[in-house]
Amino acid sequence: MSSQIKLTKNAYRLEKVKLSRLETYLPTLKLKKALLQVEVTNAIREASESIQAYEAARESIYAFAELYSVPLYVDAIANSFKIEKVEKDYENITGIEVPVIRNIILAESSYSVLDTPIWIDTLVAYSREFVINKVRSEVAAEKQRILEEELRNVSIRVNLFEKKLIPETTRMIKKIAIFLSDRSITDVGQVKMAKKKIQQRKEESECA
């Protein structure tokens, strides 16, 4: 693209304006990159903690696997795994929208306390904890993915500014400046030469 730019004063002015804009915007990009790095670190920690909680809840379920399969109480426990609604919102982090869980509504487990053993309450509690932590881990993973993708994109732009756009624009400004300077010197030389020829012709005409 730089080879297509004309070596003129107007082109020089435009390249100077372009460089000024690039150098003005770069600090903003670098700040966003730094903030995103912090947010990604936090998101990774949050996702890791959510996965650990989910896996711990799953282990609790496995520990009572035989009780979950008792035909007489399957229906009483089944609803504790059902999600009626996940209320999600989105918050803005460094200009990017990321999901946030506001509430997880589970189906009501309807069973008679008198007609079921006491351990049913424990199984229902474990079941609900398992489902809630599963949803939280999924949303935390989604948040992490979104922030990591944005960080990659911003990092690419910072690298583009630092390694390509600013150096190329700077080189083009120097190239145009050198060309204009050389042309100015050439023009001055040509003017002097023309004046010298005019003077010579004048002197020759006076001698004649």
Curated annotation (Swiss-Prot):
One of its GO terms (molecular function) is ATP binding. GO terms for biological process: proton motive force-driven plasma membrane ATP synthesis. The keyword Coiled coil does not apply. It comes from the Bacteria. Pfam families: ATP-synt_D (PF01813). Keywords: ATP synthesis, Hydrogen ion transport, Ion transport, Transport. InterPro entries: V_ATPase_D. NCBIfam families: PRK02195.1 (NF002565), V_ATPase_subD (TIGR00309). Produces ATP from ADP in the presence of a proton gradient across the membrane. Belongs to the V-ATPase D subunit family. This is V-type ATP synthase subunit D. It comes from Chlamydia caviae (strain ATCC VR-813 / DSM 19441 / 03DC25 / GPIC) (Chlamydophila caviae). The gene is atpD.
